[in-house]
Curated annotation (Swiss-Prot):
Family the UniProt entry places it in: Belongs to the scoloptoxin-16 family.
Principal subcellular localisation of the protein: secreted
Tissue and organ expression note: Expressed by the venom gland.
Signal peptide segment: 1-28
Protein name in the entry: U-scoloptoxin(16)-Sm2a
GO molecular function: toxin activity
């Protein structure tokens, strides 16, 4: 008698593998609290941002968006650079500029 393949195991394995691939090519996003002033996001950089407005932290290469929080509050949604798997023989570069141009990348041109 032959054993039947465990379709649940195969499906879960496929989904996990697919998720790992997505993580390696996608930026991450997180949501957190931020100071509020006059109903706007106050990142303490001298400017106030309305819901939907974006600003950048080019030193750490983030894009931040002021979003509607819970119960009438505001929050910040932080988007960062994609995470890349290490590439053998390539050099990791850290360019300057505004997000997403400041995101690190692998330079494989000398291969």
């Amino acid at each position: 008698m032959c054993a039947k393949p465990n379709h649940l195991f195969v499906t879960v394995t496929f989904i996990f593998g697919f998720a790992v691939c997505i993580v390696q090519i996608s930026a991450w996003t997180s949501i957190g609290k931020i100071a509020i002033k006059d109903g706007k996001c106050d990142p303490k950089n001298g400017k106030l941002y309305s819901i939907g407005e974006k600003w950048h932290n080019n030193e750490d290469c983030f894009e931040i968006t002021c979003i509607q929080g819970n119960k009438g509050t505001v929050a910040q949604q932080v988007t960062s650079c994609p995470v890349h798997a290490m590439k053998t023989g390539c050099k990791l570069k850290f360019p300057k500029g505004e997000f997403p141009n400041c995101c690190p990348f692998y330079d494989c041109s000398k291969n």
